[in-house]
Amino acid sequence: MEYRNLGASGLRVPVLSFGAGTFGGKGPLFGAWGNTDAEEARRLVDICLEAGVNLFDTADVYSAGASEEVLGQAIRGRRDAVLISTKTALPMGEGPQDWGTSRARLIRATEQALRRLGTDYIDLLQLHAFDASTPIEEVLATLDGLIASGKIRYIGVSNFAGWELMKSLAVAERHGHPRYVAHQVYYSLAGRDYEWELMPLGADQGVGALVWSPLAWGRLTGKIRRGEPLPAASRLHETAQYGPPVDDEKLYDIVEVLDAIATEIGKTVPQIAINWLLGRPTVSSVFIGARNEEQLRQNLGAVGWSLSKEQIERLDAVSAATAPYPYFPYRRQEGFARLNPPIV
């Protein structure tokens, strides 16, 4: 397994990490994702550790805390061998302190997560969303205190806009608070919006990308193709409305190129889609999920080999999107590109 520094931090993480969204299985969304219990979760953790995957990601909102509980049971007795990443901010109830990133909420949410996980520290705590109702200074001062207390070690964010992340980094620098080292983002061959602003920001500021849904919410599994009905067992029947938007015709074009490359090199469509991401700038780790051992072992096969330059160019071309303003002049006009050439 290859390991990379998480952004500009000294924390080294595997290029593949395990997303525990399938653990617990409560509610319409997470129930459709999977219902992995503690016994099965422990087997999946065993497989991950054997392969060198030691970072496990969850969130308090996943199955109303059950995902954290199951993960905690699955890693019991081997805490020193794993890195735990969890997230908070989204609503866990209807009370005034059940959502957001206020001082009261962050302290309580961290303590609750520690209890559910059965540990006394969290390696990486991420804000699941930007809370516009809480001053950034309050958020960062609280996180600074949690780091000083030993309850968390590194901090990151998820699903932030560029200005939200940049302002947070500036406030941290101004007041001497720890900086965010990771941004958990949606990024896939079927969704490359991350590249317009968040990727250059991450490269400039040393914020590593942790990629969620590398298979485009289950659309790049190799089971969805042009002219064929959605498989009866696909979770997209229940979860499509929760996921990122996808242009179906473009998706089919991407899958056709993935199919062709899969035939050429003897790899699967998901393995190729994940491997492509590992070659993109700023990507520290890609989160893979699995409802069973077979899915996990297949996804683990995405590392240990490389796509050719020609294959990467084909995937780049078929998945390319039209850049929105103000990004398109830098990709279409030499004068603009000379001043600020795109990263990809």
What are the roles of these predicted feature ranges?
Residues 27, 33, 93-197:
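Glycine/proline-rich, positively charged
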Residues 45, 68, 72, 110-114, ...:
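Generic structural signal for well-ordered alpha-helices
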Residues 1-2, 42, 204, 228-264, ...:
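Terminal-tail/helix-coil boundary detector
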Residues 88-90, 161, 187-191, 213-221, ...:
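Glycine-rich beta-alpha junction loops
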Residues 6, 18, 41, 48, ...:
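Conserved, mostly hydrophobic/aromatic
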Residues 11-16, 52-55, 78-82, 118-123, ...:
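Short, well-ordered coil/turn segments that N-cap beta-strands
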Residues 194-234, 268:
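Aromatic-lined glycan-binding groove of carbohydrate-active enzymes
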Residues 1-82:
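N-terminal binding-site loop/beta-alpha segment at the start of enzyme catalytic domains
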